[in-house]
Amino acid sequence: KVQIYADVAIGVSNILKKYDLLNAYEYATALKEYNGISFADDEMEAYKNGSKGIDWQNLMLQTGISQDYKLGISGGTAKNKYLISANVLNMTAMTITTKYQRAQLRINLDNELTKWLTLSTKINASRTHSHNGGIDIMNFLNYSPTMEMKDPVTGVYNMDPYNSVNGNPYGARVA
């Protein structure tokens, strides 16, 4: 008897609560008050009206989605049995730097050649692709909201000039 099965699972993940962080204007004001770092008046105005500055949480966080698809067929006779199944998994995390994909194929064949001899074949194949930019949430939460994202001349992602030794988290995102 032939049996066919299919299964689909979809999942969604989201951060429950974002951190209450300083915006670019508040951060620039704090740098000026506590470290004596001064910004030009037009720059401060741009931070204040929101036309300049980086909201790292809005930039780096997304809704994570998981999609898992399974399909299989099995059957046979009393002496010959088979099972063939396939699985595709696609996951994007809550951070834009992380993604995981996997495809699997499985084949099982059992053939009873005699009462005392059965030939079994089992084949498993899998292909996996993962991207983890090495960025945890604290990396981008500590990045300055007042920095320029890229060097305008080279196009290279800038490092935070004030308080992080880690690379620019946006540069590690999944393309």
Predicted features along the sequence, with ranges:
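Outer-membrane beta-barrel channels and translocator barrels
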Residues: 66, 77-78, 114
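Short hydrophobic/aromatic-rich motifs at helix boundaries and adjacent loops
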Residues: 40-44, 76-81
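Structured alpha-helical segments in the cores of large, soluble enzyme domains
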Residues: 69-75
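Surface-exposed loop/interface segments of Gram-negative outer-membrane beta-barrel transport/assembly proteins
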Residues: 3-53, 63, 93-100, 104, ...
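C-terminal beta-signal and adjacent terminal beta-strands/loops
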Residues: 58-60
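A beta-strand signature from Gram-negative outer-membrane beta-barrel systems
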Residues: 1-5, 66-68, 81, 87-89
